[in-house]
Design a protein with these regions (language model features):
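Small-molecule-sensing regulatory modules
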Residues: 2-59, 78-107, 116-363
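Conserved, well-structured functional cores that handle cations and Mg-NTP chemistry
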Residues: 65, 75-79
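Active-site charged/polar residues at nucleotide-handling catalytic sites that mediate phosphoryl
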Residues: 72
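Periplasmic solute-binding protein
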Residues: 110
Length: 363
């Protein structure tokens, strides 16, 4: 696959899926991170993200997002891990920036007819006497590369793989294939077509991921900075997902005594790193304020444990309890950013030099 030279264009480009649930989920996630995609004309395939000036957004089929990353036509992409593995085929230039964007969750697996009572595992399928060199197992899939590698790794030689783009579940009933290898989410479609998964037949787990070209990250000005900002926003939003801030007024003699009381209530009341305790200034009759009677305690807790937290705070004398969702939780530095720099052979000071248009520090 011929690769476009870096100097062939100046604009930074990101490719995202153009159709289907993956496209909707991608844009919803970006919008949640204040990275809304704006398309001036609904018929156009090019768009922009106003909060990221200088970057073009291109709507492409999922397969083409990966291909255009490989050819250098886009620098950044959002795509399912399944498609990255199938089309990217472990291309060393493709770097996974974020491997768990929280949507598109599914897995790629082998499914056989439910009528095959004696085939409930891959080992049983492998030893099935019905299939031989003269009469190989016929597998239909849209993931030819992954299927070929999977069956080879399992030592299954008597397999013929055919390709199809849709309605794979109908192939065994039609007699066009013996089994399928396809994406599974809930498994409902398999059951409705009288198919079943087998033990050991799971090829990989998949969900949406953020991918970038290694060459673009290192050589195209601005790409690494944009990826850093996107990663910060994504990590902060995803970390806050399902986390609520609970605030209560607690009586105490000092902030330290209140903090000790809260922490003694167990791990639930310790929040993300520990409770935040702040003095409340109570208005007095003479117009002044008095500190030290009540303290505001704020704790980040999972949504599923909100009421349990409220009850615990009440037992400690808490009142005026407020609960509100968190939108972002920014870390000191996202762990995935540190990991990305390591994959690129860079350190934090190298990023600072690159962001100023300078060469990385020689080592």
């Amino acid at each position: 696959m011929k690769k476009q030279p870096i100097e062939a264009r100046e604009a930074i480009r990101m490719g995202i899926p153009s159709k289907g649930r993956m496209a909707e989920d991608t844009q919803d996630l970006l919008k949640s991170c204040q990275l809304s995609v704006r398309k001036l004309n609904p018929r156009q395939y090019a768009a922009e993200i106003p909060n990221v000036p200088g970057m073009e957004v291109w709507f492409q089929r999922a397969t083409d997002v990966v291909r255009k990353l490989m050819t250098g036509d886009v620098d950044i992409g959002i795509v399912g891990y399944d498609m990255l593995r199938e089309i990217g085929n472990e291309d060393e230039d493709l770097v996974i920036v974020h491997d768990a964007l929280g949507f598109g969750g599914c897995h790629l697996a082998v499914a056989v007819p439910q009528a095959w009572d004696n085939v409930n595992s891959l080992s049983q399928l492998k030893s099935d006497p019905r299939f031989s060199k003269e009469r190989p197992l016929r597998v239909v899939t849209a993931y030819v590369n992954l299927a070929t590698k999977f069956f080879k790794d399992q030592g299954m030689e008597n397999v013929v793989i055919t390709t199809a783009d849709g309605a794979l579940e109908a192939a065994p009933a039609m007699g066009a294939a013996d089994c399928i290898l396809d994406l599974v989410s809930s498994g409902t479609t398999l059951r409705e077509n009288n198919l079943k998964e087998i033990e050991g037949g799971r090829v990989l787990d998949s969900q949406g991921c953020l991918v970038a070209s290694r060459e673009a990250l290192l050589k195209r000005p601005g790409v690494l900075e944009i990826v850093h900002e996107m990663l910060e926003r994504l990590e902060a939003h995803l970390r806050a997902n399902g986390v609520f801030m609970v605030t209560a007024n607690v009586r105490g003699s000092s902030a330290e005594s209140v903090a000790e009381k809260i922490c003694s209530g167990g791990s639930l009341l310790r929040g993300l790193q520990g409770p935040t305790v702040s003095p409340i200034y109570t208005p007095q009759n003479d117009g002044t304020t008095k500190e030290g009677q009540f303290y505001a305690v704020s704790i980040g807790v999972p949504k599923t444990r909100i009421y349990e937290t409220v009850k615990s705070l009440r037992r400690m004398g808490g009142s005026g309890v407020l609960v509100f969702p968190m939108t972002y939780v920014f870390d000191e530095e996202p762990p995935r950013w540190t990991s990305l720099l390591a994959q690129l052979g860079l350190k934090a000071e190298d990023f600072n030099h690159l962001s100023r248009g300078e060469a990385p520090v020689a080592r």
